[in-house]
């Protein structure tokens, strides 16, 4: 009887596996047919010859799959034509990029593509109204419909796309008023070159002027102030105000300024002699000239006082709004820029909400802390916008103007939900400022080590694991963003992992280590890879080591450079202490006592400990790449991360639409 029961269970399990396999095969076959139908109508030049029935569709040009379903379709600049209606059957699609083609017609109903995160359809011939089905794609992070022939109004339901980071609608024929798109995460926004009218909503008014230009009837900040011409005849300011007043009947309204005194007196002016008229005019002219000179003298004197008072603040101030979409001041007009650069200028990256340098100087400031690269401040601007400003005056001693600007161009291009993105920078001979988004929930260091008194709320395991995964994704994105330069962070530590309003980890201060004096690096000994002790340069492998130390800090609750050995009372670095404890088979002694209150997490903690020990291998070649570390951590968490808009292809970020074109920018010293 037992054998029969076992046989039945085994048979049922086999049937379920077979059914699942059939379903996956059927779905894969459906995706294959969908792509072949699209090829028949769109590929008139034969660029998709690899798409045929004899090969696996997951190996076709521009196609990526997950579990035999098409999840990514990137077909850019290959002269595709026709409609994209057939693609709506690709229900597992996460990334769709068809920019720089000749596709046309209206956008079909995309509501079936519920997994879509990135949609790039720019530089085509699409037409019709804004595709309202897009507003139902609640996982969407980036939407680019620019340089097409769309028309009509923008639906206010765009506010339902709460994760949206990019909204590019420039160079179309959209009209009507811009809706109040109040999306807190929106970073990259442009509606220039359309037919919008009315006032710019307050929620968008701090984006640069360039993103609203070429809309003749658009007004309000940052464009010209709207002038309200009321059609209400009772409103003041109209030339025919007397007609409009309810106190005047139409028949009593004067037709000329003098007729109110009667018709006879209007002829008296003709009796005034010519000499008297000239005398009156000369007298008025002399009086007006005297008053004008007096006012000019008073105002000029006040202006001179103010100019002298504020000359140090205002001298050489110049705000540059970058295009393309990043600053290119180091590439053109070298002589002019050198002159401006000596005095100082502020450069904003496109999509950043603008403000004047004076606004920053007037803002209420709160010091957040001092680090190896300078002092960080929280600045609250007059409009309530909060930014973080890092002052590098004392730290950046080895970088020249050209080297500094080239590095800023590269760093300013990096955009990811797990990075604290660089918004703007100011460069002058005596002052260097970096402007970032303000992260209100502090740093990982403070959450782990701050206020360990009795009233403290400990950091639970789920939150620690989420922070570890987010920081890993951010660092992996930096490493994969530009293969030719092999970018590094250079200073991974818990104070450089910040938390945004949603509790997501964001890596900060990346790419600044090349400017730091050697003594600054020495202060991060607890995180420093062994190979850096003899003065070698930072590498991606040394970043991996530092990240491994960070994981050990999360697991143990101990500061990396403050671990006591227990017998001698001396201190030892955290990786060596963990290795010694594990070697003596006291693994449970490694973990933070605050984690012991949680049940059924020991297996996950041991798994993360193994990752940390692999990252802190003494030999750099034995350490894993960050892309692999991300996968290992996500496996512990129990699946892929839906929170990251750039999770697809994290090891090939250069080819990912998560990045703008030419991520590497110009050459830079690294």
UniProtKB/Swiss-Prot annotation:
Protein kinase domain residues: 362-636
Active-site residue list: 491 (proton acceptor)
Cysteines engaged in disulfide bonds, as pairs: none
Stretches of the chain found on the membrane's Cytoplasmic side: 296-670
A single cellular component GO annotation: plasma membrane
Glycosylated residues in this chain: 52, 79, 102, 109, 112, 149, 182, 190, 268
UniProt-annotated location(s): Cell membrane
Residues annotated as signal peptide: 1-29
Positions where Phosphothreonine occurs in the chain: 463, 616
Record-linked Pfam families: LRR_1, LRRNT_2, Pkinase
Keywords assigned by UniProt, alphabetized: ATP-binding, Cell membrane, Glycoprotein, Kinase, Leucine-rich repeat, Membrane, Nucleotide-binding, Phosphoprotein, Receptor, Repeat, Serine/threonine-protein kinase, Signal, Transferase, Transmembrane, Transmembrane helix
Compositionally biased intervals (Polar residues): 253-266
One Gene Ontology molecular-function label: protein serine kinase activity
Domain of life from the UniProt record: Eukaryota
Membrane topology: Single-pass type I membrane protein
Region (Disordered): 230-266
PANTHER family: LEUCINE-RICH REPEAT RECEPTOR-LIKE PROTEIN KINASE PXC1, PROTEIN KINASE DOMAIN-CONTAINING PROTEIN
Protein name: Probable leucine-rich repeat receptor-like protein kinase At1g68400
């Amino acid at each position: 009887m037992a054998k029969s029961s076992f046989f039945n269970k085994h048979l049922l399990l086999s049937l379920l596996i077979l059914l699942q396999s059939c379903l996956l095969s059927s779905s894969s076959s459906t995706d294959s047919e969908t792509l072949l139908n699209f090829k028949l109508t769109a590929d008139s030049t034969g660029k998709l010859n690899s798409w045929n029935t004899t090969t696996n569709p997951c190996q076709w040009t521009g196609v990526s799959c997950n579990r035999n379903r098409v999840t990514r379709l990137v077909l850019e600049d290959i002269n595709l034509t026709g409609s994209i209606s057939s693609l709506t059957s690709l229900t597992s699609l996460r990334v769709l990029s068809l920019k720089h083609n000749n596709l046309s017609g209206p956008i079909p109903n995309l509501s079936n593509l519920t997994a879509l995160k990135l949609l790039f359809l720019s530089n085509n011939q699409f037409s019709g109204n804004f595709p309202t089905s897009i507003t139902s794609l609640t996982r969407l992070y980036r939407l680019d419909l620019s340089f097409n022939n769309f028309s009509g109004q923008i639906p206010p339901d765009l506010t339902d796309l709460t994760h949206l980071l990019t909204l590019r609608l420039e160079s179309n024929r959209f009209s009507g008023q811009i809706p109040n798109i109040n999306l807190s995460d929106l970073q990259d926004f442009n509606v220039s070159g359309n037919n919008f009218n009315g006032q710019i909503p307050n929620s968008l008014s701090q984006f640069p002027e360039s993103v609203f230009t070429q809309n003749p009837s658009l007004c309000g900040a940052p464009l010209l102030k709207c002038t309200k011409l009321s059609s209400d005849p009772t409103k003041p300011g109209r030339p025919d105000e007397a007609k409009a007043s309810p106190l005047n009947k139409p028949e009593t309204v004067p037709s000329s300024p003098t007729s109110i005194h009667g018709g006879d007196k209007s002829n008296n002016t003709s009796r005034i002699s010519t000499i008297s008229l000239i005398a009156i005019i000369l007298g008025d002219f002399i009086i007006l000239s005297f008053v004008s000179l007096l006012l000019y003298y008073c105002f000029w004197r006040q202006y001179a006082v103010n100019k002298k008072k504020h000359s140090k603040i205002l001298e050489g101030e110049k705000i540059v709004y970058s295009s393309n979409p990043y600053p290119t001041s180091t590439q053109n007009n070298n002589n002019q820029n050198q002159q401006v650069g000596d005095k100082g200028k502020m450069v904003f990256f496109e999509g950043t909400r603008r403000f004047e340098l004076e606004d920053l100087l007037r803002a209420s400031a709160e010091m957040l802390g001092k680090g190896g690269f300078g002092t960080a401040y929280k600045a609250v601007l007059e409009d309530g916008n909060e930014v973080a400003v890092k002052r590098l005056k004392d730290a950046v001693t080895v970088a020249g103007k050209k080297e500094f600007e080239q590095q800023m161009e590269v760093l300013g291009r990096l955009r990811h939900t797990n990075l604290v993105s660089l918004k703007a920078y100011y460069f002058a001979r005596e002052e260097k400022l970096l402007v970032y988004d303000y992260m209100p929930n502090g740093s990982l260091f403070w959450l782990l080590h701050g206020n360990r008194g009795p009233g403290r709320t400990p950091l639970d395991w789920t939150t620690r694991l989420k922070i570890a995964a987010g920081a890993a994704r951010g660092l992996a994105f930096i490493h994969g963003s530009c293969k030719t330069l092999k970018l590094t962070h250079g200073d991974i530590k818990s104070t450089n992992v910040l938390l945004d309003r949603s509790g997501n980890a964001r890596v900060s201060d990346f790419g600044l280590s090349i400017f730091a004096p050697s003594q600054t690096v020495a202060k991060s000994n607890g995180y420093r890879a062994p190979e850096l002790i003899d003065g070698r340069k930072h590498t991606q492998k040394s970043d991996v080591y530092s990240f491994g130390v960070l994981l050990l800090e999360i697991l143990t609750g101990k500061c990396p450079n403050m671990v006591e050995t227990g017998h001698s009372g001396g201190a030892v670095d955290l990786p060596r202490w963990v290795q010694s404890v594990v070697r003596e088979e006291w693994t449970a002694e490694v973990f933070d006592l605050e984690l012991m209150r949680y049940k059924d997490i020991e297996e996950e903690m041991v798994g993360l400990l193994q990752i940390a020990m692999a990252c802190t291998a003494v030999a750099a070649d034995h350490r894993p790449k960050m892309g692999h570390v991300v996968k290992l951590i996500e496996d512990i968490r129990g699946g892929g991360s839906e929170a990251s808009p750039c999770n697809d292809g994290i090891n090939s970020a250069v080819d990912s639409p998560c990045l703008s074109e030419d991520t590497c920018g110009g050459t830079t010293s690294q």
